[in-house]
Design a protein with these regions (language model features):
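Extracellular low-complexity Ser/Thr/Asn/Gly-rich intrinsically disordered segments
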Residues: 1-545
């Protein structure tokens, strides 16, 4: 029997006659709901088995035959009462999934081994049969509608033993299938650059949950982000190109119910932004005072109409008018100052099509005119052969850039290189000749600004190196005491200046002073002694230029 069901009344019988037969019985397992012993028949009772496997009680019945006051006990007989347990089924988790998803396989279990499970499904449209036995394999969930569909699965556990099937308490769980998310069709838009795109509010036919929307934009240059969620607010359309730009917006709906999001098929629409008239960028120019600018031919990427150009110049002193139309021809740049002058040229394009002029944004470029760098005056130098020159430090009045000084020397024999850059350090002057040597140094200031170098007007100065003064050899004289010497006239090979002479006499007793300048006139020689007297005259020449 099953736990909780009634055991049929047991009425003992016998073949004995001619007396009275009574019965006594014992029960070895009182857990089934029957006492341990009794006499007479066994009445109906409710079978009990609170365990998880069948319980069997053995009933031993002993007959006693009585006649004329004598009781005779006969052999006992046994029989069994088996009580099957009540099967159970473990709770099954509900499932919530999207149309087209695979369900999780359901494996039933319970406390009683050998239990089978019978189930019914009240909504076969989800893709599951109306009924079945055993576990439920994974299947593809189906919901072709617009609202969630929930199927209730009722599971009944059954334990069978001794050809007796015992059902347990049914349990239920649900499988809810969310619909495929949908988004309503969105109209395409065509707008102008700089104008507002109309707000886009997405809609759906789905109900019974929440539908959200995510979108992507394949062309962010129109002023809309690459992606977003929810509706698209009004935004200013952008097209910085020269032809219409079309962005394709792909919107994907997601339907959420019970915390499960289900993504539906995407839909697309377009936003087309027409361009604005434009002028191509113009390169800046940096040039030198007095040179020609590069002619400027304006251009545009716009097509399908005519683009004209008007321009204004904020610094006409560079040699260009204050305003004009069309291209700008080459002109001679002017800067009479000492620092760069920059003119800003602002160009406005006008695109005309069908008789309608459309003015686009302006663009600006600059023309910078570097000044002509001038070298400040440098003093000439006159030095002696072997003497040190004064270091020459160049300078200029030019500002706003870098000034470099390049110089050449037409007479490297003076001890200075034929050319160089920068200041000239002091050096030892050289002149191995007999006349002054003059070197002309030509220095050119080079002014650099904006990677453009501009040479100024060269300036010159001189370094004159006087020769080493010389005096020609003078013949020795031997004279008698009291006689006149021969006058001595000094001479030199030097030219190009004036050579003077100073002399000293180491023996004034001969009648000649101890020192003097210029030539030595004849004089009366004196020697009051008894032996010859020799005087040494040392002459020093000085060359002046």
């Amino acid at each position: 029997v099953c736990n909780g069901s009634n055991v049929t009344a047991i009425n003992f019988g016998t073949a004995n006659t001619g007396g009275t037969t009574t019965y006594s019985w014992t029960n070895d397992n009182t857990t089934i709901g029957l006492g341990a012993s009794g006499s007479g028949n066994i009445a109906v009772f409710a079978a009990v088995n609170t365990g998880t496997s069948p319980v069997t009680a053995t009933i031993t019945v002993t007959p006693t035959f009585t006649n004329l006051g004598v009781s005779c006990t006969g052999p006992s007989k046994t029989f069994t009462i088996t009580v099957n347990p009540t099967p159970t089924v473990n709770a099954v988790s509900d499932q919530l999934l999207c149309n087209g998803d695979a369900t999780t396989a359901v494996t039933f279990g319970g406390a009683v081994a050998g239990t089978t499970y019978l189930w019914t499904n009240n909504t076969p449209s989800i893709g599951l049969l109306a009924s079945g036995t055993g576990d439920i394999a994974s299947f593809t969930a189906v919901n072709t509608g617009t609202v969630p569909v929930s199927a209730t699965i009722t599971v009944t556990p059954r334990f069978t033993n001794g050809s007796v099937g015992c059902n347990g308490t049914p349990t239920t769980f649900t499988i809810t299938v969310n619909p495929t998310a949908q988004v309503n069709t969105v109209s395409n838009q065509v707008v102008c650059n700089g104008s507002n795109v109309t707000a886009i509010n997405f809609g759906t036919v789905n109900t019974g949950g929440t539908t959200t929307y995510s979108w992507t934009n394949n062309n962010t240059t129109i002023g809309l982000g690459a992606s977003g969620a929810g509706n698209i607010a009004v935004f200013a359309a952008v097209n910085t190109g020269t032809s219409p730009v079309t962005a394709t917006i792909t919107v994907t709906p997601t339907f959420t119910n019970g915390g499960v999001p289900c993504t539906g098929p995407a839909k697309t629409f377009t936003i087309t932004v027409n361009p604005t008239a434009e002028v191509n960028a113009v390169s800046n120019q940096v040039i030198c005072n007095g040179t020609n600018t590069t002619a400027i031919a304006f251009g545009t990427g716009n097509t399908g109409g005519t683009t004209t150009y008007s321009w204004v110049n904020n610094t006409p002193s560079i040699g260009l008018g204050a305003s004009g139309t069309g291209n700008i021809a080459a002109f001679t740049a002017i800067n009479t100052g000492t620092s760069p002058v920059t003119a800003t040229i602002t160009v406005t394009p006008t695109f005309t099509n069908g008789g309608v002029p459309c003015t686009g944004p302006t663009t600006s470029f600059t023309i910078t005119v570097n000044p002509s760098a001038q070298v400040n005056a440098v003093s000439n130098q006159v030095v002696c052969n072997g003497g040190n020159t004064t270091a020459v430090t160049f300078s200029s009045t030019a500002t706003g850039g870098t000034v470099v000084y390049n110089w050449t020397n037409n007479t490297p024999s003076i001890g200075l290189l034929a050319s160089g850059t920068g200041d000239i350090a002091g050096f030892t002057a050289v002149n191995t000749g007999t006349s002054p040597v003059t070197a002309t140094i030509t220095v050119t200031a080079q002014y650099a600004n904006g990677s453009i170098a501009c040479n100024g007007t060269p300036r010159t100065f001189t370094i004159t190196v006087n020769p080493t003064a010389q005096v020609n050899t003078v013949s020795n004289q031997v004279v008698c005491n009291g006689a006149n010497t021969t006058a001595v006239t000094f001479a030199t090979g030097n030219t190009g200046g004036t050579t003077t002479y100073s002399w000293i006499n180491n023996t004034p007793s001969i009648g000649l002073g101890a020192s003097g300048t210029g030539n030595i006139a004849a004089f009366t020689a004196i020697n009051t002694g008894t032996s010859p007297v020799t005087a040494t005259i040392t002459v020093t020449p000085t060359f002046t230029n």
